[in-house]
From Swiss-Prot:
Record-given protein name: Chromosomal replication initiator protein DnaA
Annotated signal peptide: none
Domain of life, source organism: Bacteria
Start and end residues of each stretch annotated as Domain IV, binds dsDNA: 357-476
UniProt main location, coarse: cytoplasm
Length: 476
């Protein structure tokens, strides 16, 4: 007779040590392990809360878990990966340290399919001009923002995977779907890709993409013209509502109240709500608690600044789309020096291409250096390790000299790790060079500090906020 309790606890401990906190809480912690009562051979059921987790575990972790089971029980063990809704009612209680409680980061809220849209409100005098513009593109979606044109890397792979799941099953998979991250990291592209996919699959779907400031303007107009009934009929009748940069709702009480009603109406009707923000939901200034709590009902994912390989891929794909012949060495040069976000990356590419066309010279590595020399000179002058150390020390209220010291107390070690991580992010220096600038430390110490901050950013919104704030300060 198999005893799964001890095995699953060992499994949880292994993955908790191997994965980041976000990965562990998202993929492993929600799983439940049960004995299989209807199999002639020794068998275990590994139960996933939804299809998204099931597929991800199958692709990335199932072979490891199976191998650990065979090592633990010292014999072949059949491991069945199943969806929670497929488990018989007589199944035995779940085992594991989470006591069967699934992680709140992923929740499959609804099972019913999206219903057909209601009729849109009739035109009024005050909305006639706006309606005429909307008739050309009522969704307000950019048709070039698709999943095919979205470059995927470690920084956004979870967000993209969730977006595809939502696009394929709107109102069923994760509702709401909340994406947060800094400026220019692809949040708008990703949510509009969902909208374009939904419209392609169902042209009759009533989809609306809107920036939060435009939504605020709609609320103001409805208030001025006493047209809240029509406002509500329109927004409550959507099949898919995509709200961009919801942080601008902060402090706007009437807007938040109307959005609260719209949010509830759409969720109750099994219609999809998708939101982007520049910060984690609980960190949004001036946002009502009742909205913040609802943002956590579905899936919340972060997008991070792209890593080097992803930046190169973005440049090459952009060049291909624009019929630009771009050598990989030129793409690598641009990507190595432009690290902040996708918009600045594409801006640098446009600058290099324009310089090539104006001068009539081929787009070579030397030309790229010449075209970007002013930009790179400003970056090199402003963002040095010394500047990073001083900025981080001032931020955490410690002495700059403590960056080089041997002190290991948390009040000094954490800022030092933060400065090392930012140095790796913002400078082209190697790990040994960064270590040398921090009191002659070994490159492995720098790498450990970088990974530690990355792990904390995934699990602690305060650390992530500090990191992004410092990047913003240093970049000016």
């Amino acid at each position: 007779m198999l005893a799964p309790d001890t095995f699953w606890l060992a499994c949880l401990e292994y993955f908790e040590n191997e994965l980041s906190a976000q990965q562990f809480n998202t993929w492993i912690k929600p799983l439940r392990l049960q004995l299989s009562d209807d199999s002639p051979e020794p068998a275990l059921r590994l139960i996933a809360p939804n299809r998204f987790v099931l597929q991800w575990v199958k692709d990335n972790f199932l072979s490891d878990i199976t191998q650990m089971a065979e090592n633990h029980f010292a014999r072949p063990v059949q491991l069945q990966l199943e969806l929670a809704g497929q488990i018989p009612a007589s199944a035995s209680p779940s085992t594991g340290r989470n006591n069967g409680t699934a992680s709140h980061s992923i929740t499959a809220v609804f099972d019913a399919p999206t219903e057909s849209a209601q009729k849109a409100p009739k035109d009024t005098k005050d909305t006639k001009d706006a309606k005429e513009k909307q008739e050309k593109n009522p969704t307000r979606l950019n048709p070039s923002f698709t999943f095919n044109t979205f470059v995927t890397g470690k920084a956004n792979q979870l967000a993209r995977a969730g977006a595809i799941q939502v696009a394929e099953r709107p109102g069923v998979a994760y509702n709401p779907f909340f994406i947060y991250g800094g400026v220019g990291l692809g949040k708008t592209h990703l949510i509009q890709a969902i909208g374009n996919f939904v419209v392609e699959q169902n042209p009759a779907a009533k989809v609306r993409y809107i920036h939060s400031e435009q939504y605020v303007s709609d609320v103001v107009r409805a208030y001025q013209h006493k047209a809240f009934d029509e406002f509500k009929r329109y927004y409550h009748s959507l099949d898919l509502l995509l709200i961009d940069d919801i942080q601008f709702f902060g402090g706007k009480n009437r807007t938040q109240e109307e959005f609260f009603y719209a949010f509830n109406a759409l969720i109750e009707a099994h219609k999809q709500v998708i939101i982007t923000c520049d910060s984690y939901p609980k960190e949004i200034a001036g946002m009502e608690e009742r909205l913040i709590s609802r943002f956590g009902w579905g899936l919340t994912v972060a997008v991070e600044p792209p890593e080097l390989e992803m930046r190169v891929a973005i440049l090459l794909k952009k060049a291909l789309m624009e019929d630009i012949i771009l050598d990989e060495s030129v793409a690598f040069f641009i990507a190595k020096h432009i690290r902040s976000n996708v918009r600045e990356l594409e801006g640098a590419l446009k600058r290099v291409v324009a310089y090539s066309r104006f001068t009539g010279h081929a787009l070579t590595l030397d030309l790229a250096r010449e075209a970007l020399k002013d930009l790179l000179a400003v970056q090199n002058r402003q963002i040095s390790i010394e500047n990073i150390q001083k900025t981080v020390a001032d931020y955490y209220k410690i002495k700059v000299a403590e960056m080089y010291s041997k002190k290991r107390s948390r009040v000094v070690a954490r800022p030092r790790q933060m400065a090392m991580a930012i140095s790796k992010e913002l400078t082209p220096l190697s790990l040994p060079d960064i270590g040398e600038a921090f009191g002659g430390r070994d490159h492995t110490t720098v790498l450990h500090g970088y990974r530690k901050i990355a792990e904390l950013r995934a699990s602690d919104p305060a650390v992530n906020r500090d990191f992004n704030t410092l990047l913003h300060i240093l970049r000016g």
